[in-house]
Amino acid sequence: MLFMINWSVDGGNIREANERFSSGEENFFGCELIGRWHAPGNIGVLIIEASDVVSINKYMMQWDDLVDVSVTPVMDDAGALKSLEG
């Protein structure tokens, strides 16, 4: 399953979040990072592939003290086309 994770960092947590991200010690708990994009204003989005929501939750728990997130299951074009089949 694919999951879109929108994230934002509160101004008071920017330094610590940047240090944690720069450390390279991020654990994906069996999830596969498809892509991550950063935008001005301390916001961004990730696409992660995972077999279950538990893995996503474990991944997010390492950031929940610094980052606000929303997680949405998503599908690619092939999945969207399958959903249109009767």
Task: Give residue ranges: language-model regions.
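Conserved, structured core segments of small domains
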Residues: M1-G86
